[in-house]
From Swiss-Prot:
Mg(2+) 2 binds at D88, D92. The gene is preA. Keywords: Isoprene biosynthesis, Magnesium, Metal-binding, Photosynthesis, Transferase. This is Prenyl transferase. The lineage of its organism: Bacteria, Bacillati, Cyanobacteriota, Cyanophyceae, Synechococcales. InterPro entries: Isoprenoid_synthase_dom_sf (IPR008949), Polyprenyl_synt (IPR000092), Polyprenyl_synt_CS (IPR033749).
């Protein structure tokens, strides 16, 4: 499987600069929040989201050099993403992310919530200073979508009436919205034609949905040391994802186990078995592959270039995480 190092080669130097700048942008006026943010930016993330912004920027600028605003947009994107992870971990009461202790487990929930708020506030400040109203609207929508996604997930816990449409809507809010809107924003900053910007949005949306579906499959199939959290943790917390939704169609018993919140001994083990036996994993793979194919199609509007090639290969990378 291709590594992110070779995948992001066209923006390698840009990403190095971004990592250095992120720590500086967060600032040290609040030592505890600064320490929390420092911990986050050192937590081994692959910087996929800012890399997409940088690749789209270079693919739409072609021979022109990246502007300071394109670089700042990539930094804002990573700040927003990181803030959402911090709040996610508080809501999910998670102790590990990428096999690294979460901010809430390292400090406490109060500091974690404030650290997330701080990053959202910082990103909003830098966003406003881009002086581009359309980009401000696109990224502000992402912050709203994060909250809406968390609310949707919370109110639908252990709800077996959840359908595929609701699942995809929640996945868009929590994952795809940031990738879609930031990709479009990069096109806007490059003064790309309107239809190109719209295709960039669609690329990001379908790539983001594929990414989330793959994540949800891995939650069932990957051991803790690979995933950085216990296998089946989504199901345990009542978050019903694509593999469980598909398996419930074949095995209604799975729905009953979920509704009683795995209260009896052996319930969870049986539920995980039913997901595997009920074609939940196979059908979810097909769903992810379909979203990936849609993402590929929307890149045809870009001229051939190394950054465009990386954006195409990124689609294969997302699906390749399953192997």
């Amino acid at each position: 499987m291709i590594s992110t190092t070779s995948l992001f080669a066209p923006v390698d130097q840009d990403l190095r600069l971004l990592t250095d700048n992120l720590k500086r942008l967060v600032g040290a006026r609040h030592p505890i929040l600064g320490a929390a943010a420092e911990h986050l930016f050192e937590a081994g993330g692959k910087r996929v989201r800012p890399a997409i912004v940088l690749l789209v920027s270079r693919a739409t600028l072609l021979d022109q050099e990246l502007t300071a605003r394109h670089r700042r947009l990539a930094e804002i994107t990573e700040m927003i993403h990181t803030a959402s992870l911090v709040h996610d971990d508080v809501v999910d009461e998670a102790d590990l992310r990428r096999n690294v202790p979460t901010v809430n487990s390292l400090f406490d929930n109060r500091v974690a919530v404030l650290a997330g708020d701080f990053l959202f506030a910082q990103s909003s400040w830098y966003l406003a200073n881009l002086d581009n109203l359309e980009v401000v609207k696109l990224l502000s929508e992402v912050i709203r979508d994060f909250a809406e996604g968390e609310i949707l997930q919370s109110i639908n816990r252990f709800d077996t009436d959840t359908d595929l449409e609701t699942y995809l809507e929640k996945s868009y809010f929590k994952t795809a919205s940031l990738i879609a809107n930031s990709a479009k924003a990069a096109g806007v900053l490059s003064d790309a034609p309107r239809d190109v910007c719209d295709h960039l949005y669609e690329y990001g949306k379908h790539l983001g949905l594929a990414f989330q579906i793959v994540d949800d499959i891995l939650d069932f199939t990957s051991p803790t040391e690979v995933l950085g959290k216990p296998a089946g943790s989504d199901l345990i917390s009542g978050n019903i994802t694509a593999p469980a939704l598909f398996a419930m169609e074949k095995y209604p018993l799975l729905g009953k186990l979920i509704e009683r919140e795995f209260a009896q001994a052996g319930d969870l083990e049986q539920a995980l078995e039913l997901v595997e036996q009920g074609d939940g994993i196979r059908r979810s793979r097909e769903l992810a592959a379909n979203q990936a194919q849609l993402a590929r199609q929307h890149l045809s509007v870009l001229e051939m270039s190394a950054p465009r090639e990386s954006l195409l290969e990124l689609v294969d990378y997302v699906l390749g995480r399953l192997h």
